[in-house]
């Protein structure tokens, strides 16, 4: 009869928040890998029952990844600050702000002026060629 030691994974000490954040990042990686794997399986079959089950499980993995990301934001305030800056940079980029305005996000005393975000500066196929 196979035996498993229920204590085999216990460590002799508790992790610090920094160590836990590193571990949670690996968990996020595993969740994203699972999402990609399930999406590939969905694309590779015509079996509707399998697709439904895979979609359900994939949605759960998406939720897990999101929950882990929220945990990282609490465990690593520096990464949380970068994430907040990224949201602002995304808003500026997609509204056509200048490169300088985007790069100024997070810098001391730098705030994009309203002139940096105008309808005329919206990205178009033509503007990307320049």
Swiss-Prot record:
Biotechnology: The encapsulin and a cargo construct (an encB-encC-encD fusion) can be overexpressed in E.coli and in human HEK293T cells. In HEK293T in the presence of 0.5 M ferrous ammonium sulfate nanocompartments can be detected and used as cell markers. Coexpression of this nanocompartment with a larger nanocompartment from Q.thermotolerans (AC A0A0F5HPP7) allows of expression of different sized iron-rich particles. The encapsulin shell proteins are not seen to mix.
Superkingdom to which the source organism belongs: Bacteria
GO molecular function: metal ion binding
GO cellular component terms listed in the entry, alphabetical order: encapsulin nanocompartment
Motif interval(s): Di-iron-binding motif: 61-64
GO biological process, one term: intracellular iron ion homeostasis
UniProt: Fe cation 2 binding residues: 31, 61, 64
Pfam families, per database record: EncFtn-like (PF22277)
Stretches the record annotates as Disordered: 103-130
UniProt cross-references to InterPro entries, sorted A to Z: Encapsulin_nc, EncFtn-like, Ferritin-like_SF
UniProt binding sites for Fe cation 1: 31, 61, 64
Protein location: Encapsulin nanocompartment
Region (Probable targeting peptide): 123-130
Record's keyword terms, sorted: Encapsulin nanocompartment, Iron, Iron storage, Metal-binding
Function: Cargo protein of a type 1 encapsulin nanocompartment. May help nucleate Fe atoms in the interior of the encapsulin nanocompartment. Present in about 92 copies/encapsulin nanocompartment.
Family membership noted in the UniProt record: Belongs to the ferritin-like superfamily.
Protein's UniProt name: Encapsulin nanocompartment cargo protein EncC
Source organism of the structure: Myxococcus xanthus (strain DK1622)
């Amino acid at each position: 009869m196979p035996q498993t030691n229920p204590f085999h994974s216990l460590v002799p000490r508790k992790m610090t928040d920094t160590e836990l954040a590193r571990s949670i990042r690996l968990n996020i990686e595993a969740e994203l890998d699972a999402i990609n794997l399930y999406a590939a399986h969905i694309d590779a079959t015509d079996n509707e029952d399998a697709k439904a089950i895979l979609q359900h499980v994939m949605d759960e993995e998406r939720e897990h990844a999101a929950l882990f990301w929220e945990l990282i934001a609490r465990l690593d305030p520096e990464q949380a600050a970068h994430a907040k800056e990224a949201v602002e940079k995304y808003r500026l980029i997609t509204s056509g702000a200048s490169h300088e305005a985007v790069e100024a996000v997070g810098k001391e005393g730098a705030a994009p002026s309203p002139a940096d975000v105008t309808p005329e500066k919206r990205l178009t196929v033509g503007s990307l060629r320049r």
